[in-house]
Amino acid sequence: MKIGLKYKNEEHIFDECISAGVPFLKYPILEKEGLVEHGISTRLGGVSEGFLGSMNLSYTRGDDPAHVDENYRRMAAAIGVKPEHMVCTHQTHTTNVRIVTREDAGKGVTREKDYTDVDGLITNVPGICLVTFYADCVPLLFLDPVKKVVASSHSGWRGTVNRMGQVTVEKMQKEFGCDPKNILACVGPSICQECYEVSSDVAEEFQKAFAGMNGTETLLYQKPEQKAEGKYQLDLWLANQLWLTDAGITPEHLEVTNVCTAHNPAYLFSHRKTNGKRGNLGAFLCLKENGTAGSRQRNGIVWQGKSRW
C-alpha cells in the first residue's frame, strides 16, 4: 500500500511506509545499515483538525496541545521510539547545531526545552531521537555508521545560503571524529525549484555564496515574466547537495529528495502552497539501542505495497 505521493522522477530515494496506521517515509540508504530508527512524517495519521490535519507536530501553530501530544505518541509507535526520549530543535533559521546528551531526553515533547536558536542536533547516544521540523524547508539527515553518530538539521533558504549542511558535517568531525567519506547524508522532502520563487536580494545572496563553485549553472533561473519584477526560481535541493559534496560527502553516500512539499498538499504540509495555514512535518532519527549492521525492522511495516518479510 503506497501513500500516494507525487515524485519528480523515478529514482528510488524513499520507501513509503505504514506502521500502527501511520504513514511515513524512510530512506533505504539509512535503513540498510541496521543502526537507526527513522522516519519523516506526512500530514496523515494524526488527530489534529482543519488546516492542521492531521499529523501536526507543532505546539506553536494554534493546535490543541493534547492533539499534538497524541500525534507524537502515534509517530513514536510507528517508528519504534519513545516520546520521552525525543529531543527537538528550536528553529529560528540559524546554523547553530547542538550536541545532544542523555540528559536532554524529552525536551520539546514531554518537557520544556532549556535552549533556543537551535536548527541542528547531533548525538552518539543510542535511544535518543532527534526531531526537526519542516513545511517547505529542507530536512538534512546524517548517519556515520563507523562512529555511530547521527545528526538532523533544518535548512531553509537562510540556513542553506549559510551552509547548514556543511556546518553540521564539520561539527560531526570536530566533536566525534567523523570522516565525511563515511557519512551518509539525505536531503529530505521540501519545496522544489519549480515552486520556489524568491526575490532578487535572496538570489543575490546565493550568487555570492556560490561564486566560483562548479555545478551552479541551474541553481537560479528566471522566467521571462519574472525579469521585470526581479524574481527567480531557486533550487534548494541542488544548493544543499553542493554544500554537502563540498564538505566531503561522496556521491554514493548522498541521497537528494525527489518529493516536493508544494506538489503534495494532500500528503505534506507546505507553507507556500497554503499561505502559512499549515502544521509541521517532523523528521525523526535515532540510533538503535542494540543496533547492528543488517538488523531487521519490527513487524507491521509495509514497504511500497510489499511486506518487508
What are the residue ranges of the model-derived segments?
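Active-site microenvironment for binding and transforming phosphate-containing groups
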Residues: M1-W309
